[in-house]
């Protein structure tokens, strides 16, 4: 019997990086998710943050409004979890609390984030990995480059 795929919450900032460039680990992670290498968990709040960030003027040079919509529609096939109740988890940056609460509510195996406030959490449940560390974990577990 095949193992269930890893369940992961990816920080919207990593997803923004994937939109900005098809080169690099963030895009590779989105591609791995599209190829069903892991289960991606999203919430209305996460998707709203992603939409808000991508609508900022500084990101207009990376894609039109239509391209942003196409990118956002990709996440319609992710596992949608209702926004969990607020929890105080990340003392250094309360704006990140919802990501950890979402991951806990969804019983995610990992959170992938480049945010230092998250990656430096000791004994985080679930563990927080940098995008590169999560990519390397996937590559090792699934035996692919």
Regions found by a protein language model. Give the residues of each.
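Short, well-structured N-terminal submotif of metal-dependent ribonuclease cores
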Residues: 1-42
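Short secondary-structure boundary segments
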Residues: 12, 44-45, 114-116
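Short, flexible helix/strand-to-coil boundary loops that buttress conserved ligand/catalytic motifs
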Residues: 19-20, 54, 122, 138
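Residues at secondary-structure transition points
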Residues: 24, 41, 63-66, 90-97
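Hydrophobic/aromatic ligand-binding patch that stacks against planar heteroaromatic rings
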Residues: 32, 102, 120
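PIN-domain endoribonuclease scaffold, especially VapC-family toxins
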Residues: 32-86
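Active-site neighborhoods of divalent-metal-dependent phosphate/nucleic-acid chemistry enzymes
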Residues: 77-111, 116
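Acidic, PIN/NYN-like endoribonuclease modules and their adjacent C-terminal/linker elements
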Residues: 106-112, 116-145
